[in-house]
Amino acid sequence: MSQAVRGQTNKELLSVCGITKRFGLNVVLKGIDLSVGRGEVLTLIGGNGAGKSTLMKIIMGIYQPDQGELYIDGEKISSFKPVVSLQKGIYMVPQEPMLFPNMTVEENILIGFSGVKSELHNRLVKIIGDIGWELDLNRKALSLSIAEQQIVELLRGMMRNAKVLILDEPTSALTFDEVEALFKVVAD
C-alpha cells in the first residue's frame, strides 16, 4: 500500500486502517478504520469489552496490532511504540489519572520536562489563562476531584503540544457536575 490511506485527506490528523487485535483466540478488534481531522471531537461508544480502550492503547503504542496501519499527519507509523506516539503529538488521558498525590498540580504537570523552570511555569500559566480555566498550581494533587485530576492530565498533554488528546472513559467516575465541567474543557 502507498503512503496514502484510502480516502485520506490532508486535513486528517490521525487515521487507522484495518486494525485487528487478538488476545489469544479472542478477536477484540477486527478491521477497524477510523480517521480524525484537525479540531474534530470524536467519541467512541460501546459496551464494556467492546475494544475502545484497546484501540486507544494501539494508537498510543502500548499494544501492538495484529494487522493494520496507523497514520499521523499523513505519515505511516511503522513502529507502534509509546515514545513514537508522544513524539508525533498524541497524548492519552487515562481512565484513572496517574498523579503523584504529594506533589503540587504544577509539579505533576511539568514532571519529565527539562528546561528553565520559570519559562515552563510561564508557558503553563499562559495555557491555563488562554483557555480560561481556574486551577491552583500550588495545590497538592491528593486534594483534587477526579475532574480536576483529569484536567491536570489534559494540561500535561497540552504542555507537550499534543495534536491529538485521547480520553479513556473520561466520565466513568464523575458526578454530573464534573462531567459538565470536563465537557466544557474539551469543547474549549
What are the roles of these predicted feature ranges?
Residues 2-188:
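Glycine-rich phosphate-binding loops of nucleotide-dependent enzymes
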